[in-house]
């Protein structure tokens, strides 16, 4: 789509013009596992009182902006920037970290954790801090879509996960440092096997459409790149992992009167439990303006360690239907993904983003798939307020730079003209002195 291509590249170019950092890294392959792991540092204490933050508290403090790009069926990491804290992360008894997704004036909380007794010099993590708390993550009545890897956000981006992600480091209620990552998802939903016609935006107004089956001709290029973990029997391996460890609602919370869970397909095509009729339905969007990180149906505290939560994100690949070409097995897809992931990637900050987005989503113009097109409003500007605001700010800065350059050119031209005129007068005066007959003709 020309409009989508123009809007996406314009957003990246203008963010670069404004001096944003450029990030672009898929998660390491060793994070793509579906078995139950409880390695690394376990939570040393429950999550303490969270910072009472409003959406405006974060948006008004954003000091570092970055761009990230995701293609295909990637397991992605969105990174915090160490420069978000002037002078670098400091030593502290408690450091709060959190991530949220911005949707206009409200935000969707995604992850929150506390680190204890940190030495500073680097972002909080298991090598910098003596302990960590339980993690509060978005999941609720659905699947495990997010996890934290240190301070980085782990997710499997779909088309509707594009947008602006806000993060913060907190050293106290009035000592908060905020940055943002704008995620561009440049992937053709009809080319990849993982069902990219999904994402957080589906619960925030967008509607997904049906995907056509992949053909053998589609299985070319980077179609297999991404996270496809080794096969495990999910029901058996994860059967002893409690919902509380993963930050999910216990099945008994949304069982029907007979004690069985009734699973329905919602408009986005994802499975969700049916709540008892006398209980209010959960707010699936959970987009807030105040109390961003307080617990809710969709944002619960997970008791499990970091490795367990990361595995829960990756194992969901094995529980959803994959759109494979006829005759292709999952094992063949996994082998192809390992080969694809091992290919050298483009290096250099600007190259990562530009190369990732030169072939953006080319969604077919079919009546039944019209809703999958990226949304662009007046003059081709995106409907997303945050992206639109960034583009307009970038245009304003570019215009000011152009006007300033024009003023400099005009000043230089005026000075040159005056110098030339003075030189002509000097030559005329010299000529008149040496030729008295011409002196009456001299005008000064």
UniProtKB/Swiss-Prot annotation:
Q: Where would you find the membrane-spanning parts of this chain? A: 390-414
Any single Pfam family the record assigns to this protein? Herpes_glycop_D
Q: Which UniProt keywords apply?
A: Glycoprotein, Membrane, Signal, Transmembrane, Transmembrane helix
Enumerate the glycosylated residues: 117, 240, 335
Q: How does it sit in the membrane?
A: Single-pass membrane protein
Q: Where located? A: Membrane
**Record's GO cellular component terms:** membrane
Indicate yes or no for the key word Membrane: yes
- What are the boundaries of the signal sequence? 1-24
What family is reported? Answer: Belongs to the herpesviridae glycoprotein G family.
Protein name per the record? Glycoprotein GX
Which organism is the protein's source?
Bovine herpesvirus 1.2 (strain ST)
């Amino acid at each position: 789509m020309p409009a989508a291509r123009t809007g996406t590249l314009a957003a990246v170019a203008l963010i670069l013009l404004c001096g944003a950092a450029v990030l672009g890294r898929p998660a390491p392959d060793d994070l793509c596992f579906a078995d139950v792991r409880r390695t690394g540092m376990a939570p040393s204490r429950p999550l303490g009182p969270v910072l009472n933050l409003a959406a405006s508290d974060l948006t008004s403090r954003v000091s570092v902006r970055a761009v990230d790009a995701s293609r295909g069926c990637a397991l992605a990491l969105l990174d915090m920037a160490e420069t978000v804290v002037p002078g670098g992360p400091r030593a502290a008894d408690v450091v709060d970290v959190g991530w949220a997704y911005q949707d206009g004036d409200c935000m969707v909380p995604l992850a929150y954790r506390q680190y204890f007794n940190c030495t500073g010099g680097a972002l909080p993590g298991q090598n910098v801090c003596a302990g960590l708390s339980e993690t509060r993550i978005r999941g609720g009545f659905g699947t495990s879509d997010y996890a934290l890897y240190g301070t980085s956000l782990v997710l499997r981006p779909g088309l509707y996960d594009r947008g602006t992600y806000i993060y913060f480091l907190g050293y106290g209620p009035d000592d908060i440092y905020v940055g943002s990552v704008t995620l561009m998802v440049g992937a053709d939903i009809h080319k990849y096997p993982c069902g990219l016609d999904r994402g957080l935006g589906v619960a925030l107004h967008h509607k997904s459409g049906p995907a056509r089956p992949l053909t053998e001709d589609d299985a070319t290029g980077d179609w297999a790149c991404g996270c496809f973990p080794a096969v495990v029997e999910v029901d058996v391996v994860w059967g002893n992992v409690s919902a509380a460890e993963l930050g999910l609602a216990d099945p008994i919370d949304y069982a029907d009167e007979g004690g069985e869970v009734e699973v329905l397909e919602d408009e986005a095509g994802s499975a969700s439990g049916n709540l008892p009729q006398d209980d209010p339905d959960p707010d699936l969007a959970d987009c807030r303006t105040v109390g961003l990180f307080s617990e809710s149906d969709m944002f619960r505290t997970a008791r499990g360690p970091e490795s367990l939560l990361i595995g829960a994100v990756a194992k969901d690949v094995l529980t959803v239907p994959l759109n494979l070409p006829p005759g292709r097995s999952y094992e063949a897809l996994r082998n192809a993904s390992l080969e694809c992931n091992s290919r050298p990637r483009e290096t250099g900050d600007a190259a990562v983003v530009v190369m990732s987005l030169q072939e953006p989503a080319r969604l077919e113009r079919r009546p039944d798939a019209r809703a999958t097109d990226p949304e662009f409003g007046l003059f081709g500007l995106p409907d997303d307020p945050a992206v639109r605001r960034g583009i307009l700010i970038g245009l304003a800065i570019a215009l000011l730079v152009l006007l300033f350059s024009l003023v400099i050119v005009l000043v230089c031209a005026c000075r040159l003209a005056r110098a030339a005129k003075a030189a002509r007068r000097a030559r005329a005066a010299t000529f008149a002195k040496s030729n008295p007959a011409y002196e009456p003709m001299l005008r000064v």
